[in-house]
Swiss-Prot record:
Name recorded for this polypeptide: DNA repair protein RadA
Motif (RadA KNRFG motif): 248-252
Recorded GO CC terms: cytosol
Entry function: DNA-dependent ATPase involved in processing of recombination intermediates, plays a role in repairing DNA breaks. Stimulates the branch migration of RecA-mediated strand transfer reactions, allowing the 3' invading strand to extend heteroduplex DNA faster. Binds ssDNA in the presence of ADP but not other nucleotides, has ATPase activity that is stimulated by ssDNA and various branched DNA structures, but inhibited by SSB. Does not have RecA's homology-searching function.
PROSITE patterns: RECA_2
Keywords linked to the UniProt accession: ATP-binding, DNA damage, DNA repair, DNA-binding, Hydrolase, Metal-binding, Nucleotide-binding, Stress response, Zinc, Zinc-finger
GO biological process, one term: recombinational repair
MF-aspect GO terms: ATP binding; ATP hydrolysis activity; ATP-dependent DNA damage sensor activity; damaged DNA binding; zinc ion binding
HAMAP family: RadA_bact (MF_01498)
């Protein structure tokens, strides 16, 4: 008799019967059926393993730089032998392009790369390589979806393989399970087998993975725990910018970003994203300001845009693109309570130019400056940048890495820095503010 249980695709919790909501993580509609294989052999006897000392010899983790500098930045300097990297993103965002550019670049002359696709045929891969001008390098390619066949093919050539690309993990299946491709059990089992094999043989493995409509990696949450590094490819299909961001990295920092521009010949690195994001900006535009932000260790200048429209609705709309909508509501409440700027009868729209997403609390001051400018009809001072966190009392608080933010702004020609007076900076071009009342006086 076939046995089955039910597993949550969000957290991996297993339950004996189906329910509409996971009792462990509370997510609705995440419970899926999983067939338990009845021919598994349970081995109860283990083998002894030797202990090691925490103070014992450490094998140095050598980094292998790739030809893609922005990719190296996100990883923390390059690839580490035996590491497993998961790259997620919407379909068509550029994951396959990035992986093919990596595997079929001059990197392939130093490392033996194998590109395995379960989504395309070999001819389709070759045609894409021709379009991206990547046919000069002798990279091995394989079109396969069966896990056992893939591992057997790698095993036969493992002495000539240093890096494996799997595009994508959702298409790989194992004969041990009867469930269809892309299910929780298939993804978990196949990913676990591939990652373990790669680590045992000191091979670098890169797995691509689709994301759900909520922006989460498709498949079980355990997939993120199996790998050493989790990267997300962010961007809008209507925008040519792409952001590669690290969310987990055992060999480097978290939150680092790499910026790319999608072109007809593939992904192009953007080494100075601040200049590119501000290239088409006009001066003295009402409702816009420049935020001096930090993404990982990289300073980045971004344009914040605000628009207000009179509304007859009982509850006017508040919309934020690239920024937290709840934080926008908080800032509007502080403006109303602390400086008497009542926006209850206005629709408020906020957008971060270039398709970027900001989570830095230091963006509060730039957002508030744009809102005050849009509400009063007065532009912010020319050639000015803003950074600072706003408290519920309306005070402007100091932020991390102020010097780094200022240097990036000065490098791009901005000569007026508006930040908290608690930064204790003595530059002549700094206008210190301690409260929202001071900011309102500047924008008039």
């Amino acid at each position: 008799m076939t046995k089955k249980h039910y597993i949550c695709s969000n957290c991996g919790n297993i339950s004996p019967k189906w329910s509409g909501q996971c009792f462990d993580c509370g997510v609705w509609g995440s419970i899926v059926e999983e067939i338990i294989s009845t021919n598994q052999v349970i081995v109860k006897v283990g083998s002894k393993q030797d202990f090691d000392k925490l103070s014992g010899h450490v094998t140095e983790q050598l980094r292998i730089p790739t030809p893609i500098g922005e990719f190296n930045r996100v990883l923390g300097g390059g690839l580490v032998l035996g590491s497993a990297i998961l790259i997620g993103g919407d379909p068509g965002i550029g994951k396959s392009t990035l992986l093919l550019q990596l595997a079929a670049s001059n990197f392939a002359s130093k490392m033996n790369c194998l590109y395995i696709t379960g989504e395309e045929s070999l001819d389709q891969i070759k045609l894409r390589a021709i379009r991206l001008n990547l046919t000069n390098y002798n990279t091995d390619i394989l079109a396969a979806t069966n896990l056992e066949n893939i591992i057997a093919s790698i095993e036969a050539n493992k002495n000539n393989i240093d890096l494996i690309v799997i595009d994508s993990i959702q298409t790989i299946t194992t004969k041990e399970l009867s469930s269809p491709p892309g299910t929780v059990s298939q993804i978990r089992t196949c990913a676990n087998e591939l990652v373990n094999y790669a680590k045992q043989n000191n091979i670098i493995i890169l797995l691509s993975c689709h994301v759900t409509k909520d922006g989460q990696l498709a498949g079980p949450k355990i997939l993120e725990h199996l790998v050493d590094t989790v990267l997300y490819f962010e961007g809008d299909h209507n925008n040519h910018f792409r952001i590669l961001r690290s969310y987990k990295n055992r060999f480097g920092g978290v939150g680092e970003i790499g910026v790319f521009e999608m072109s007809g010949s593939g992904l192009i690195e953007v080494t100075n994203p601040s200049e590119l994001f501000l290239m088409q900006r006009e001066q003295n535009v009402i409702g816009t300001s420049i935020f001096a932000g930090i993404e990982g260790s990289r300073p980045l200048l971004m344009e914040v845009q605000a628009l207000m429209v009179p509304s007859n609705m009982v509850t006017p709309r508040r919309s934020a693109v690239g920024w937290d909508a709840n934080r926008l509501s908080m800032i509007l409440a502080v403006l109303s309570s602390r400086i008497g700027l009542n926006l209850a009868n206005y629709e408020v729209y906020l957008s971060i130019a270039g398709g970027l997403k900001i989570a830095d609390p230091a963006s509060d001051l730039a957002v508030t400056a744009s809102l005050i400018s849009a509400a009063t009809g007065n532009p912010v001072p020319e050639h000015s940048v803003f950074f600072g966190e706003i408290s519920l009392s309306g005070e402007i608080r100091k932020t991390a890495k102020a010097e780094t933010r200022i240097k990036e702004a000065v490098k791009l020609g901005f000569n007026k820095i508006i930040c908290s007076k608690f930064e204790n900076l003595t530059y002549d071009f700094i206008s210190s503010v301690s409260h929202l009342k001071d900011l309102k006086e500047i924008i008039k």
